[in-house]
Amino acid sequence: AGQVAVRVILISQDAANRAWLQGATYRGAVQTGDVMPSGAIAEVLASEDPALAPGDLVYGDIGWQSHAIMPGAALRKVGPHRPLTHHLSLLGVAGKTAYHGLFQAAGIHAGETLLVSAAAGSVGSLVGQLGKLKGARVIGVAGGPEKCAWVRDTLGFDECLDYRDESRP
């Protein structure tokens, strides 16, 4: 597959980006001047790859930059059937982490109780919602009454414990 020139439309900002700055993960540390690795949605401007044409929308590990030239094989077309942001959230790093952590690592089942730390965060919020869809009782842990209210009322968790509430034993 040939090279493709793209213009970035949306980038994903994930908790992993902070860890990548420190080099404490499966990737080497991001150095000054490096492009921050990240999933991104981009528009194809020019293509030497027969599978991609100018105007196509694509997803890939493009990073935090306005434009890039990269192998077409590193990109996948984005279909028009869902909002573009879904490719960076539900289908991005946070969504994949939530899905694999809950179903492959934890193996949650209907009727079980699931405790989710960082329940208001990108991964925790998805873990809790997936747990509810699976039929689990979901208890979130978050910092502050506003976050706990959002976790319960908007995300649908059964309960939320405020770790900042000093009145709790």
Question: Language-model features: where?
Answer:
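Gly/Ala-rich phosphate-binding loop of Rossmann-like dinucleotide-binding domains
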Residues: 98, 128, 132
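Glycine-rich beta-strand-centered segment in the early N-terminal region that forms part
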Residues: 1-13, 21-64
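NAD(P)H dinucleotide-binding glycine-rich loop of Rossmann-like/cofactor-binding domains
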Residues: 36-43, 54-118
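Alpha-helix termination/capping residues and helix-transition junctions
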Residues: 49, 107-108, 154
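Adenosine-nucleotide cofactor-binding segment
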Residues: 132-169
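N-terminal Rossmann-fold NAD(P) dinucleotide-binding loop
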Residues: 124-125
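Active-site-facing substrate-recognition patch
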Residues: 16
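Residue-level detector of flexible, active-site-proximal loop/helix-junction positions
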Residues: 51, 74, 82, 145, ...
